[in-house]
Amino acid sequence: MTNPVTQKKSLKLLFIAPKGKKDSKTNQKPLFHMAIGVLVSLTPKEHHIEIADEHFEDSINYDGDYDLVGITSRTIDATRAYEIADKFREKGKKVILGGLHVSFNAEEAMAHADCIVCGEAENLWATVLEDVSLGCLKPTYNAKDFPPVTKIVPLDYERIAQASKREKVDGSKSIPIYVTRGCPYECSFCVTPNFTGKLYRSQKPEDLKRQIETAKKVFFKANRKSSKPWFMLCDENLGVSKKRLWETLDLLKGCDINYSVFFSMNFLEDKETIRKLVESGCNMVLVGFESIKQSTLEAYNKGHINSAEIFSQVIEECRQAGLNVQGNFLVNPDLDSFKDMDDLVHFVGKNHIFMPIFQIITPYPGTKMYWEYKEKGLITDYDWEKYNAINLVIHSEHYDPIAFQHKFMTSYYKTYSWINIANRVKHNPYKLLNLITSLAFKKNLKEQLNTFECNHNIRTTRSIK
């Protein structure tokens, strides 16, 4: 007598993007979490999908009849992700956890889930769904046990829109997309080399064009202020060679969009690349300057990148071409003094850097820095909600942690003084965008600074306007 064949069933899935209590407030968040967008696009059509994104104040239905609840998590969202997972499991639901944080904290995450996924899901998700359908879900699925991911999954924007119930937006809200994945560099503070990997992958031109046109149709609504949609390119590094970069920019030029992108300083030293960026619709590049000190850049494995003088020159060339440069800077108590912070504030103001971002160096799980600091016993706090880059979670030989954080926050806030905002708007292109984003940052930073001073009984006669 033969055993009956077990039939796979159609599943009802809920994908959740949690928001940590100390996650930053921003008006620049993309319309959906890219990890969830990829999962939706990988999931066969016979399965029903719902999305709940707490960054958009979506409510979570804990009483839904879901066959599987999938939760993705960054480090800052991990505590909230575990809270949600525990609540669903109390109600007897199957929970799967994945994402950056879970991939490098598997043992911790296992206590809150029926199953965890480590690494990229592209080549393992079909197996997970099949096992759920057959009632034999395994405790762990690790990307290392599956064939390497060599392609980018085209996003199914129609299905994402249907599952998320997100309304159409104008050109002031960003639609996320991948053009490439992977990065060949090994910056010590970055998780990309150990998660996405160093293998550089590009979208097929026809796939990219089709996705952009579909995204326009389901997510964009033109108005008097914006005739083109704004896409946020979520690539870790858009170009690894000038030839491939220019091919990508020529392709984007024909798509009639505006976009912003993370970009390597190396390519911005070429004026023709700047011109092609602008002509292809790029209105903003986010550049990881990290520091204006050469010794600090070398400590981060970025010593090959340049100097403050070249930074200033490139920023001005971009500005003259019509391109905003958003600068990201890291502050490290082992490498940077209070005077260095003052110098950084001066540099940002002098160069009118668009929407500057300051971050205290944070050893995120999965980075080379995390393993080094943990091995040396230098991590002082494992409260993941504090891993938002404005809290000091590492040991400092030179500074009191509270004094260092306060200096950092006041320095950061100074870059959004009224005079700096006015000069930024005056000197940069896209003046309305500069004003709106600067005001939002100023409001958020003021709230964070006031809360910090209140919590630590810091009295100040601050005169920052």
Language-model features and meaning:
Residues 2-217, 226:
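Acidic, low-complexity intrinsically disordered segments
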Residues 22-23, 105-108, 295-301, 331-339, ...:
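Flexible glycine/acidic-rich beta-alpha junction loops that bind and position SAM and/or redox cofactors
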Residues 73, 77, 101, 121, ...:
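Structured beta->alpha junctions
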Residues 66-75, 246-252, 256, 337-353, ...:
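Short, electropositive alpha-helical surface patch
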